[in-house]
C-alpha cells in the first residue's frame, strides 16, 4: 500500500516515506540494542513528533513510586502535581498494580454490548460509597462532564418540560471542565477558545462565589435552566476557595428553582481536599457528581457520573455510550483505587498534612511578604499566589524551573500562581523539604532570575475574557 501511495503521490511522498522508514528503523535498532535515551533526546523527540499543545517543565518521568519520580539519568524528584490530582494514592501503588495485573490476565474489554463480571461490582461499590442510586461510566474527565451535560439537558426536557432546544446550563467564570468543544464553550480561558469557534450555545456565566448573581440568573432564566455546573474549589483558576456558606446557598437556590446542582469533583474529589468530596466541607449533596482522575489512581483513565434514578434513567439505550466506559480492567482498578483511599485513611491524612503544609508555607510568606500575596488551599490541594510586581520580570513558570533544580516538581497555573498538590501518600519530611526549597528559591534564585530575564511590555499586559469581559488571572 505504501508503495502504491508513493507511486501516486510522486517522488516527494516516496522520499517522505523513505525518511520515515529510516528513522523508525534507526530508533527500533537502538531500542532493540538496549540503548538508553537521555532526557534531552526524549524531549527533543517529543518536540519534533508531538503536537505542541503543552508547555511542560523540562523533566522526563521514567519511574514513579509513591511521591517520588526518577528521570532517565536517575535524578530523584518529589512530585507536587500528582498528574493534576490523578495519583492521589501515589505513583504505582502496589495494590492497584496488583488489581491491574490480575485483571489484565483475565479480561480487559467487553464493551457495554455485553455484561462483564467486574463493572457491576464497581457500580455497586461506587454508588454505595458516595450515596447515589446509579452511575454512568466513562473514561476521561472531559467525557464525564460532557456526559453530565447531556444527562442534565435530557432531564430538563423530560422532567422539567423545557421547550425543545432551549435548555441552558449555568457555569462559573474561571471554570475549567476539560478541553472538548462542548466544555470549552463554557470556558473563560481565551487560549482554550480562540480559533475553535463556533462554540456550542446554551450556556450562561456567573462569577464563582456570587450567590446574588446566581439568584438573579435563576430568576431571569430559571424556567429554561436545567443545571448549574461548578467546581467546589476552582483548580485551574488557581485553587480558588468559595466564601463560607456558598455551597449551601447554591444547594438552596437550585432546590428552590428546580435546577440540578452539578458538582465537578474530578480534581477535588477522592480525598484530595481532606474530605472524600470537596462538597462535604459544607455537608451538601449535589444532584449530579462527576468523578475522574484519582478514580483510576493514575493507572488507567476512569470517570463516572453519579445521580439518582429519577435523573439517570432519563438516558435510554442508544442515547449515550462509550466503547471503553465500564470496561473490566478499569472497573477492577477503580475498586482497588477506592479501597486504598479508605484502607490507608487518605482523607484524614490529606486534612492533617495539608494543614501542616500550609503552616509551613505561611512561615515562608512571613519571610517574603512582598513576594507571596497568599497561601490558600484545603487538604493537599494548595496554591501560593505571588505578587506580579515583586516577581517581575520572572514568572511562576520560572520559579517552577528553579524548584525542579532543587528536586521539587510543581506547575504554575497562570503567570503568578503555583499549585502544590502532591500525592496523599507524601511524608511530613517531604513536605518540609518542599517548603524549604520554595524558601530557598525566593531567597537565592529569584534575585538572579530577575537580573537575567529581560523585562518586556507584553508580560505586563492585562487580558480579559472574550466571553464575559472579566479580568483574567
Curated annotation (Swiss-Prot):
Per its UniProt record, what Pfam families does this chain match? Aminotran_3
Provide one Gene Ontology cellular component. mitochondrial matrix
Subcellular location(s) per record: Mitochondrion matrix
Q: Which PROSITE patterns match?
A: AA_TRANSFER_CLASS_3 (PS00600)
Pathway it works in: Amino-acid biosynthesis; L-proline biosynthesis; L-glutamate 5-semialdehyde from L-ornithine: step 1/1
Keywords of this entry = Aminotransferase, Mitochondrion, Pyridoxal phosphate, Transferase, Transit peptide
Q: Per its UniProt entry, which superkingdom is the organism in?
A: Eukaryota
Describe what upregulates or represses it: Up-regulated by SNAC2. Also induced by high-salinity, heat, and submergence. Strongly induced by abscisic acid (ABA) and auxin (IAA), and slightly induced by brassinosteroid (BR) and jasmonic acid (JA).
- Report the catalytic activity: a 2-oxocarboxylate + L-ornithine = L-glutamate 5-semialdehyde + an L-alpha-amino acid
> In this chain, where does the modification N6-(pyridoxal phosphate)lysine occur?
293
The cross-references to Gene3D superfamilies, in alphabetical order and at most eight, read:
Aspartate Aminotransferase, domain 1, Type I PLP-dependent aspartate aminotransferase-like (Major domain)
> What is this protein's function per UniProt?
Confers drought and oxidative stress tolerance mainly through enhancing ROS-scavenging capacity and Pro pre-accumulation.
The record's comment on protein family reads: Belongs to the class-III pyridoxal-phosphate-dependent aminotransferase family.
Protein's name according to its UniProt entry: Ornithine aminotransferase, mitochondrial
- Which lineage? Eukaryota, Viridiplantae, Streptophyta, Embryophyta, Tracheophyta
Amino acid at each position: 500500500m505504501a508503495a502504491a501511495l508513493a507511486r501516486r503521490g510522486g517522488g516527494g511522498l516516496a522520499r517522505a516515506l523513505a525518511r520515515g522508514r529510516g528513522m523508525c528503523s534507526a530508533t527500533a535498532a537502538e531500542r532493540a540494542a538496549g540503548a538508553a535515551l537521555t532526557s534531552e533526546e526524549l524531549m527533543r523527540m517529543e518536540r519534533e513528533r508531538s503536537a505542541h499543545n503543552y508547555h511542560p517543565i523540562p523533566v522526563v518521568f521514567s519511574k514513579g513510586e509513591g511521591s517520588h519520580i526518577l528521570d532517565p539519568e536517575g535524578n530523584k524528584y518529589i512530585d507536587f502535581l500528582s498528574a493534576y490530582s490523578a495519583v492521589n494514592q501515589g505513583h504505582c501503588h502496589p495494590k492497584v498494580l496488583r488489581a491491574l495485573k490480575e485483571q489484565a490476565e483475565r479480561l480487559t474489554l467487553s464493551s457495554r454490548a455485553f455484561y462483564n463480571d467486574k463493572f457491576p461490582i464497581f457500580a455497586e461499590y461506587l454508588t454505595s460509597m458516595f450515596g447515589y442510586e446509579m452511575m454512568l461510566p466513562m473514561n476521561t474527565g472531559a467525557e464525564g462532564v460532557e456526559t453530565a451535560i447531556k444527562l442534565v439537558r435530557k432531564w430538563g426536557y423530560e422532567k422539567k418540560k423545557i421547550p425543545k432546544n432551549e435548555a441552558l446550563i449555568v457555569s462559573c467564570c474561571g471554570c475549567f471542565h476539560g478541553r472538548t468543544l462542548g466544555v470549552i464553550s463554557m470556558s473563560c480561558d481565551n487560549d482554550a477558545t480562540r480559533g475553535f469557534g463556533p462554540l456550542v450555545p446554551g450556556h450562561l456565566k456567573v462569577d464563582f462565589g456570587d450567590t446574588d448573581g446566581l439568584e438573579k440568573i435563576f430568576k431571569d432564566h430559571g424556567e429554561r435552566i436545567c443545571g448549574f455546573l461548578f467546581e467546589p474549589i476552582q483548580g485551574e483558576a488557581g485553587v480558588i476557595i468559595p466564601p463560607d456558606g456558598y455551597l449551601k446557598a447554591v444547594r438552596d437556590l437550585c432546590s428552590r428553582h428546580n435546577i440540578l446542582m452539578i458538582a465537578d469533583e474530578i480534581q477535588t474529589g477522592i480525598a484530595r481536599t481532606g474530605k472524600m468530596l470537596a462538597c462535604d466541607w459544607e455537608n451538601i449533596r449535589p444532584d449530579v457528581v462527576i468523578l475522574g482522575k484519582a478514580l483510576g489512581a493514575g493507572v488507567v483513565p476512569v470517570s463516572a457520573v453519579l445521580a439518582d434514578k429519577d435523573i439517570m434513567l432519563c438516558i435510554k439505550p442508544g442515547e449515550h455510550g462509550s466503547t471503553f466506559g465500564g470496561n473490566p480492567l478499569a472497573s477492577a482498578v477503580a475498586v482497588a483505587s477506592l479501597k486504598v483511599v479508605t484502607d490507608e485513611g487518605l482523607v484524614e491524612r490529606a486534612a492533617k498534612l495539608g494543614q501542616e503544609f500550609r503552616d509551613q508555607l505561611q512561615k515562608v510568606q512571613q519571610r517574603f511578604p512582598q513576594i507571596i500575596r497568599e497561601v490558600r488551599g484545603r487538604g493537599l490541594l494548595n496554591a501560593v499566589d505571588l505578587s506580579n510586581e515583586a516577581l517581575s520580570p520572572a514568572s511562576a513558570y520560572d520559579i517552577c524551573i528553579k524548584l525542579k533544580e532543587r528536586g521539587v516538581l510543581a506547575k504554575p497555573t497562570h503567570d503568578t500562581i503555583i499549585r502544590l498538590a502532591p500525592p496523599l501518600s507524601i511524608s511530613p519530611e517531604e513536605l518540609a523539604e518542599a517548603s524549604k526549597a520554595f524558601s530557598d528559591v525566593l531567597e537565592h534564585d529569584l534575585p538572579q532570575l530577575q537580573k537575567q530575564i529581560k523585562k518586556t511590555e507584553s508580560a505586563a499586559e492585562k487580558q480579559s475574557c472574550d466571553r464575559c469581559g472579566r479580568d483574567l488571572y
